[in-house]
Amino acid sequence: MDKQWAEVCCQVPAGLVDLLADFLVELSGNGVSIDNRALDTFTLDGIEELDTATVRAYFDPATDMAGQIAQIERFLGDNAAAFGGAPIPAPTVTLIRDEDWATGWRQHFVPTRIGRHLVIKPTWEPFAPEPGDQVIELDPGMAFGTGTHPTTRLCLEALETLGRPDRVLDVGTGSGILAIAAVRLGARQVIGTDIDPDAVIVAGENCALNGVEVELVTTPLALIPGRFDVVLANILAEDLVRMAGDLAAKVAAGGHLILSGILTEREAFVVEGFGRSGLALVAVSREGEWSCLVYRNEG
Ligand SMILES: C[S@@+](CC[C@H](N)C(=O)[O-])C[C@H]1O[C@@H](n2cnc3c(N)ncnc32)[C@H](O)[C@@H]1O
């Protein structure tokens, strides 16, 4: 049977988060998680701080949960005054299965066909390719990009329709999935860049797994030399618009820019943001709540 955990959830003043997290790690002997805000950007510059945050801790349910909760309530009561004085809601306890907590995502990651010939295959799953299939083996680790997310899928579909590119730049490479696909589709030179050094390590492992050569860097976009036949950026609307000038400058004459990570409700915002980029919008595709825009440098 799957192991179970008692998930204790505390909503506390933002200033108390670090102190509480340390206390809960000590008390539970396990890690804690702090809920992320749903932001449309990877950059925190100019983002207003929230007043409260949610901290979750994980206990073995066989332990004395009533005793643990009493200790947590005492800790919250002792600290409430120092952090605004408002009463802190009582922690809630939910029983969850281990698979939900740590590795549940693996169940949903099965070999997936995308476009006509691309197949994304988890390293641990068997798969019998059909003639012409381009199989990408992947273990995303903690980096984003299994191909199961619509933003990645939309990018891969758009990339395949553009035929065989020569030079490709993958901005925000994550697991390296788009960069590897570009090589599989025949690109001669591919550069993948990410602001997250851990993502670059995972991307490197995935490139090695697939026997493909991709130059992986953490170099800021503006400092990457040259122009590319295809520039891919599956980031988020705010970031794409902020980077519009640098992204457009990297597209060679006759080349394409594929933008993804855009909630459809933010599509108009991105179209407007690229209005003065000098590129022409040539295709829009959508899946679920996500949009993907393809621009062309007509110059
Ligand atoms: C949504 S993931 C995309 C991963 C993968 N390319 C895919 O399509 O599945 C976005 C990635 O962009 C990276 N990122 C965010 N802002 C960036 C920036 N300004 N320059 C480069 N990478 C960035 C993040 O660290 C993250 O790995």
From Swiss-Prot:
Q: Where does it live in the cell?
A: Cytoplasm
Report any one BP term from Gene Ontology: methylation
Q: Which reaction does it catalyse?
A: L-lysyl-[protein] + 3 S-adenosyl-L-methionine = N(6),N(6),N(6)-trimethyl-L-lysyl-[protein] + 3 S-adenosyl-L-homocysteine + 3 H(+)
Keyword Lyase among UniProt keywords: no
Q: Please provide the record's keywords in A-Z order.
A: Cytoplasm, Methyltransferase, S-adenosyl-L-methionine, Transferase
Q: What does this protein do?
A: Methylates ribosomal protein L11.
Q: Which Pfam family is one of those matched by this entry?
A: PrmA
The principal location of this protein is cytoplasm
Q: Which GO terms describe its cellular component?
A: cytoplasm
Please spell out the taxonomic lineage of the organism that makes this protein.
Bacteria, Pseudomonadati, Thermodesulfobacteriota, Desulfuromonadia, Geobacterales
Family according to the record: Belongs to the methyltransferase superfamily. PrmA family.
The record's InterPro entries line, in alphabetical order, gives: Ribosomal_L11_MeTrfase_PrmA (IPR050078), Ribosomal_PrmA_MeTrfase (IPR004498), SAM-dependent_MTases_sf (IPR029063)
According to the UniProt entry, what is the EC number of this protein? 2.1.1.-
UniProt-listed Gene3D superfamilies: Vaccinia Virus protein VP39
Tell me one GO molecular function of this protein. protein methyltransferase activity
Name of the protein described by the UniProt record: Ribosomal protein L11 methyltransferase
Residues reported to bind S-adenosyl-L-methionine: 152, 172, 194, 234
**Record's keyword annotation contains Methyltransferase:** yes
